[in-house]
Amino acid sequence: MAVAMRAQCAKVQAARPARATTVVCRASAQSRRELLGLGVLLGAAALAPAANAGVVEDLLAKSAANKALNNKKRLATSYANLARSRTVYDGTCQFPENFFGCEELAFNKGVKYIAEDLKIECEGKDAKSCGSKFTLRSK
């Protein structure tokens, strides 16, 4: 918001000619509104709460603490993705057994990398928040 000072100035003649003329300037209604808006904006900025740097520090500490677990999960997922791409070729996910999908078969029969990935995914979380607990039938 650009604040432009607009004023109306008028020369006022003194009653006696010995006095100098004075200039009286009055702000227009528009500039008063702009100044009032600027004042409200500055007041709101002063009353706004400061950013909490403690939250960022807590998140960084939590991330550093979970780094080893996250690296382990990332490696297991990489191996599991390779195993998923080879399940049909290797014969670990064949037709009669894969009716509910290869993930279900891997969880129940223990396909090497996929089953390990599913177990590691829920490590460090409570049972309710784990996204890998999708199975239709469990052991």
Swiss-Prot record:
Compartments (UniProt record): Plastid, Chloroplast thylakoid membrane
GO cellular component, one term: chloroplast photosystem I
Database matches in InterPro entries: PSAN, PSAN_sf
Listed transmembrane segments: none
Keyword line: Chloroplast, Membrane, Photosynthesis, Photosystem I, Plastid, Thylakoid, Transit peptide
Membrane-related topology note: Peripheral membrane protein
Record has Chloroplast as a keyword: yes
Transit peptide range per the UniProt entry: 1-53
Family the UniProt entry places it in: Belongs to the psaN family.
PANTHER family documented for this protein: PHOTOSYSTEM I REACTION CENTER SUBUNIT N, CHLOROPLASTIC
The protein's role, per its UniProt record: May function in mediating the binding of the antenna complexes to the PSI reaction center and core antenna.
Protein name in the entry: Photosystem I reaction center subunit N, chloroplastic
Record lineage: Eukaryota, Viridiplantae, Chlorophyta, core chlorophytes, Chlorophyceae
Gene: PSAN
